[in-house]
């Protein structure tokens, strides 16, 4: 059964997500936990942490300048123990350096935070869900969140897992055509029984939650067969390799920079959060039903180089040129102001965002459109 939806999309869109125990996400969680520990001790910490996991080895590297002290290995073990690993499973190598003095001097000038690098960041919003996120992205995450709950109920389920969802859009309605789940398990359950458990306890409940109740999609559970060996033992992991999972799936562009392990002076993270903040304002105001915001940055400069808004012909009340004028006039914020406004050094525990996406959680400061009245007033003056 297709459900009604506010959307002008036509055709198939495929979204994916990965779980807590996926090797790339293990690395992201470790990197963000190290970042959290640094910022907890000193808000002026500069962190660019990378993690590599393969077989029984975990390598933690990068540049960290902080007045505090963080035991990166013990921080990593807190993540790994939560996933069921013990001290005999991994050895560690650590190669942490201070941030380059040249970069540090360029980033901090006159108590102002400047862009830690050049780059392009992208934000997106669409009114097809109440979170103003693409439906397929939310579905892909929801299947794995539900499966994660089951790992606490059934010992035969493990944390390395992936999802993939095929949605077919047409004429303001959407059908879920196919759901693919690959979930690590033990030898204590047969593949046939595993498929029944996942279909009945994960796929169908989530589909019902989203209104897909009458027509069951094609369900593929572990289509490759058994999946006993998982995590870094089966597949090498690296920070920053799931940037599309972290954002908007196939629905929007991406600037290319990853988020995990990076403090707010890094525009890859802060710029992407800011772009989402702007896009959500535009859709919340009804200026467009779909919006993509691209922001470019110049190394050592405090303000955006450019902000470009695309509405994909979904803007009715105001011309896209006018929307761009208003956005560039109002949101030409410095990085210091962005960090303050989005509470990036006060509110955020970054490891909470290392899995299941950085956008769509209404509690996140960048998800709260606080400037609606000011923008509405400004566009009327420009109009």
UniProtKB/Swiss-Prot annotation:
Coiled coil: none annotated. Pfam families: S-AdoMet_synt_C, S-AdoMet_synt_M, S-AdoMet_synt_N. Its main location: cytoplasm. Residues 99-109 are annotated as: Flexible loop. Binds 2 divalent ions per subunit. Binds 1 potassium ion per subunit. Pathway: Amino-acid biosynthesis; S-adenosyl-L-methionine biosynthesis; S-adenosyl-L-methionine from L-methionine: step 1/1. InterPro entries: ADOMET_SYNTHASE_CS (IPR022631), S-AdoMet_synt_C (IPR022630), S-AdoMet_synt_central (IPR022629), S-AdoMet_synt_N (IPR022628), S-AdoMet_synthetase (IPR002133), S-AdoMet_synthetase_sfam (IPR022636). One of its GO terms (biological process) is one-carbon metabolic process. Mg(2+) binds at residue 24. GO terms for cellular component: cytosol. It is an enzyme of class 2 (transferase). Its cofactor is Mg(2+); K(+). It catalyses: L-methionine + ATP + H2O = S-adenosyl-L-methionine + phosphate + diphosphate. K(+) binds at residue 50. ATP binds at residues 22, 160-162, 235, 241-242, 258, 262. GO terms for molecular function: ATP binding; magnesium ion binding; methionine adenosyltransferase activity. Keywords: ATP-binding, Cytoplasm, Magnesium, Metal-binding, Nucleotide-binding, One-carbon metabolism, Potassium, Transferase. Signal peptide: none annotated. PROSITE patterns: ADOMET_SYNTHASE_1 (PS00376), ADOMET_SYNTHASE_2 (PS00377). Its EC number is 2.5.1.6. Homotetramer; dimer of dimers. PANTHER family: S-ADENOSYLMETHIONINE SYNTHETASE. Belongs to the AdoMet synthase family. This is S-adenosylmethionine synthase.
């Amino acid at each position: 059964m297709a459900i009604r939806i506010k959307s002008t999309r036509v055709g198939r869109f495929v979204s994916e997500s990965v779980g807590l125990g996926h090797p790339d996400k293990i690395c992201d969680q470790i990197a963000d936990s190290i970042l959290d520990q640094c910022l907890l001790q000193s808000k002026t910490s500069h962190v660019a942490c990378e993690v590599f996991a393969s077989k029984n080895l975990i390598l933690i590297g990068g540049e960290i300048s902080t007045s505090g002290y963080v035991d990166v290995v013990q921080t990593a073990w807190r993540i790994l123990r939560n996933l069921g690993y013990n001290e005999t499973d991994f050895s560690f190598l650590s190669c942490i350096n201070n941030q380059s003095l040249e970069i540090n001097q360029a980033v901090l000038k006159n108590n102002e935070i400047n862009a830690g690098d050049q780059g392009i960041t992208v934000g997106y919003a669409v009114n097809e869900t109440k979170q103003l996120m693409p439906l397929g992205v939310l579905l892909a995450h929801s299947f794995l969140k539900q499966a994660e709950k089951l790992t606490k109920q059934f010992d035969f389920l493990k944390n390395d897992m992936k999802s993939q969802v095929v949605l077919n859009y047409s004429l303001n309605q959407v059908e879920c055509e196919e759901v693919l789940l690959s979930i690590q398990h033990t030898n204590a359950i047969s593949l046939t029984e595993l498929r029944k458990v996942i279909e009945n306890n994960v796929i169908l409940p989530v589909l019902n939650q989203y209104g897909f109740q009458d027509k069951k999609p094609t369900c593929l559970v572990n289509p490759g067969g058994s999946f006993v060996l998982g995590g870094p033992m089966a597949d090498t992991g690296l920070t920053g390799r799931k940037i599309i999972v972290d954002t908007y799936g196939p629905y929007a562009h991406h600037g290319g920079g990853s988020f995990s392990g990076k403090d707010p002076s890094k525009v890859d993270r802060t710029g992407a959060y800011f772009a989402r903040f702007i896009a959500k304002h535009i859709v919340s105001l009804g200026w467009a039903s779909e919006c993509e915001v691209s922001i470019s940055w110049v190394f050592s400069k405090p303000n955006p180089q450019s902000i470009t808004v695309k509405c994909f012909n979904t803007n009715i009340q105001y011309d896209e040129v006018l929307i761009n004028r208003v956005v560039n006039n109002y949101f030409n914020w410095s990085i210091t102001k962005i960090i303050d406004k989005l509470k990036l050094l006060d509110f955020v525990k970054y490891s909470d965002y290392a899995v299941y996406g950085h956008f769509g959680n209404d509690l996140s400061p960048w998800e709260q459109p606080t400037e609606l009245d000011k923008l509405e007033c400004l566009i009327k003056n420009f109009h």
